[in-house]
């Protein structure tokens, strides 16, 4: 999966998908009442990017629904995965549950169109703070109460704060998620800084272990060609980047073209191959 990074304005969706992204990451902010408000990343953000682009969350969800609904004139066939980077710093342990319910209700109405020919992309809820695991409880509770528990088949989870993997496993258990159950594990840092692949390799080992909790692993934010190659050599499932075309270029190289291909809608992002 080639994950376009910080795709927070509607106009950026095509700008990232057309050069090769089949997934996009969207930053979500919450107001003081734990309600999703904007698609927005404050300053600072990645080097060589413009921080501060934003949309009202409901309008963005409608736009990305159009981009992922077959038959819509704005349909982008390649876009198959949405990663919502949930900026939960304004929440606490109790309001995280409320935020999860609110976000599920917004997705149900504005993205899934209340279950009637809505967007088809898979969804990853990426939470930076393990203490906010109750978001994961509130989200399915809202869908269940609305009679749309089937949509949880399209939803996965990620804790993105670079915590110890066993700490994340415990947080998932507290949230009622056991075993390898729709779990992506991220690792990374802003493209302005460097970070080793040590934790990525540990996550890959966990993914490939019979007693691990991880289904898929992705690394962020990867912009340099050399780092893209190193990341692929670590056997990740996804690369988050500001330059999707660079990942496409590397995937065409002989040593990678026989080992990797771009994921399509038929590839379940929550299954470990």
UniProtKB/Swiss-Prot annotation:
Its cofactor is Mg(2+). It comes from the Eukaryota. It catalyses: an N-(acyl)-sphingosylphosphocholine = an N-(acyl)-sphingosyl-1,3-cyclic phosphate + choline; an N-(acyl)-sphingosylphosphoethanolamine = an N-(acyl)-sphingosyl-1,3-cyclic phosphate + ethanolamine; a 1-acyl-sn-glycero-3-phosphocholine = a 1-acyl-sn-glycero-2,3-cyclic phosphate + choline; a 1-acyl-sn-glycero-3-phosphoethanolamine = a 1-acyl-sn-glycero-2,3-cyclic phosphate + ethanolamine. Keywords: Cytolysis, Dermonecrotic toxin, Disulfide bond, Hemolysis, Lipid degradation, Lipid metabolism, Lyase, Magnesium, Metal-binding, Secreted, Toxin. Expressed by the venom gland. It is an enzyme of class 4 (lyase). The keyword Metal-binding applies. Mg(2+) binds at residues 25, 27, 85. Binds 1 Mg(2+) ion per subunit. One of its GO terms (cellular component) is extracellular region. Its main location: secreted. GO terms for molecular function: lyase activity; metal ion binding; phosphoric diester hydrolase activity; toxin activity. SUPFAM superfamilies: PLC-like phosphodiesterases. GO terms for biological process: killing of cells of another organism; lipid catabolic process. It is found in: Secreted. The active site is at residues 5, 41. The keyword Magnesium applies. Disulfide bonds join 45-51, 47-192. Its EC number is 4.6.1.-. Dermonecrotic toxins cleave the phosphodiester linkage between the phosphate and headgroup of certain phospholipids (sphingolipid and lysolipid substrates), forming an alcohol (often choline) and a cyclic phosphate. This toxin acts on sphingomyelin (SM). It may also act on ceramide phosphoethanolamine (CPE), lysophosphatidylcholine (LPC) and lysophosphatidylethanolamine (LPE), but not on lysophosphatidylserine (LPS), and lysophosphatidylglycerol (LPG). It acts by transphosphatidylation, releasing exclusively cyclic phosphate products as second products. Belongs to the arthropod phospholipase D family. Class II subfamily. This is Dermonecrotic toxin LarSicTox-alphaVII1.
